[in-house]
């Protein structure tokens, strides 16, 4: 079987590669005429071609810098994480700022590396009360309801309406509440740039980018709820069994296929932007 398959593979490859100049010219003309779609861009190409207006300056206070031990050749290793802006995961990111202020992670370790899933770090002795590192006393405890953010909690800069009012609109014999946006032209332009509504997926009614962050949406009008979604490079909070939601002392980063089943089961607090 091997002696048969190898020549066949070579013949097939040759048939694909050795196209005549006329065939290549015809394909180029078809693409130029719009009859065929160009090849999708690679992530690096998308970044390289992004216009200046698509970039946003990250506030320094939203950056979490983690320096690891040098590698085997003595090369420094640094990971830079951007924390999520309010109102998303606000309690957990607040805890992380307190943990950084207390230098909680200094000298701790990466405790878990699972290929195509996550890398997790924190206090390896956290479950041993005699050896566990003390946590700051004023850390918040968040309920599971904080995994989602209601539309009323969204700050104006993340909502496409400059002013949001609740109006009672008659519908048949009943009334219902609906959001009535009154955006200025400036806000409309900003919303068009920041908000990228996409299709439905298996885990949410809609998914979109809002202010550059990947979010899922469920519900409409004043009942709408938003939550961050697990994508490559997103940083989340390790926790114990429900209803525990974690403090932020144990963190992980997604390093493989997006584990979307973790959405609204674990808090997301940021994303790796370098390292």
Residue ranges of each PLM-predicted region?
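Cyclophilin-like peptidyl-prolyl cis-trans isomerases
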Residues: 25-274
